[in-house]
Amino acid sequence: MSIEDLDTVLKIESASFPRPWTRRHFLDEMEHPGSFPTVAATGDGEVAGYLCLKQVLDEAEILDVAVDPTFRGSGIGRALVDWAIAFCRVRKLRLLCLEVRVGNHEAISLYRHLGFAEVGRRKNYYENGDDAILMDLSIAQVEECDAV
C-alpha cells in the first residue's frame, strides 16, 4: 500500500464498514515497522481491495480487509487472505488471527473454507450489539500457496 493508494482505500473502507478507519489510521499502519498493509490491484492498476496485517512475535493478525463492492465475488478477498497466509509461511509464523462481525457471513464462509476456526467471541463488541467472532489459523496445517 502506498500514499497514492489511500484515496481509493478510504473509499473502499467507507463502503465496507459502518465505522471506517481514518486516513491517519492507515498512515499509522503504513509507518509501523510491524505492520504490512497491501493492496490487490486489477490489471490496469486499479485498487480492488486491501489488507492490513500486523506481526507480533510468531503470530500475525489481519486487522482490516475489504474489497471494492464492484469487485466482490471475483476472488480478490481470497487472494488477499492467501497473501497473508503465504506471508506467515515465509516468515515462519505459527498463527494467523482475525476477528469478524458475526453477521458477515460471506467473510466467515471464506475464512472457514481456508481453514480458520472460531476460537472465541467478543459479546456486544460492535456499536449495534453484534458480536465479534475470533478466528485463528494454524499456519503449520496450511497447504503451500504461492500468493507472495
Where are the model-predicted features located?
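Short glycine/proline-centered loop/turn elements that form peptide/ligand docking sites
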Residues: 77, 81, 104-107, 124-129
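Conserved catalytic-core motifs of GNAT/GCN5-like acyltransferases
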Residues: 99, 112, 117-133
